[in-house]
């Protein structure tokens, strides 16, 4: 339930109950992610898209490769497993760093185009499933987390997209951190 609160003379909205999972709300984000990333990254020079935050961290380029890999090996594959096998068969362990090999020789634009094409295919497939509430409650078996529901998996897919969009903008923002003089202390994004 949304409610208004007041502090220091300002009104702000809180969402203490958070959103309940909804396929429609998920589609609103999942359908937009490729366009958001295309608009943000397409045509930018390497200075913006190749730096990362240190060992075992992703550059914006790496994130797009990671998203491509996830579209091929995670969300749809695990959904099929849940719907077909329930929690009788364990998901394959996900390789968070597979994109390093899979992205070799590809430009950022190629990865953005590949991500957009695969995501579009996956969304057509997901929507054609006509999933019910009962389907969303079906369980699968994660190799680390144990029993998870399809609802958990699909909500995680949305948060995964949003997390990586935030990661990309954070890594890009840090490119100008030293050029900001004294202002970095006012920008929390630079301290993650």
Per-segment meaning from a language model:
Residues 42-50, 127-136, 172-177:
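Surface-exposed helix-capping loop/turn segments at secondary-structure junctions
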Residues 20-30, 57, 108-112, 151-154:
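Amphipathic, non-membrane alpha-helical segments in soluble helical-bundle scaffolds
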Residues 1-16, 50-94, 140-192:
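Short, contiguous alpha-helical
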Residues 96-137, 152-160, 167:
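Acidic/histidine-rich alpha-helical segments that form the ligand environment
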Residues 22, 45, 59, 95, ...:
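Helix N-cap and loop-to-helix transition residues
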Residues 15-23, 101-108, 143-150:
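A short, mixed-charge helix-start or loop-turn motif at secondary-structure junctions
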Residues 16-48, 70-81:
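Alpha-helical bundle segments that constitute or directly flank the non-heme di-iron/ferroxidase center
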Residues 35, 39, 43, 81, ...:
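A generic structural signal for well-ordered alpha-helical segments enriched in polar/charged residues
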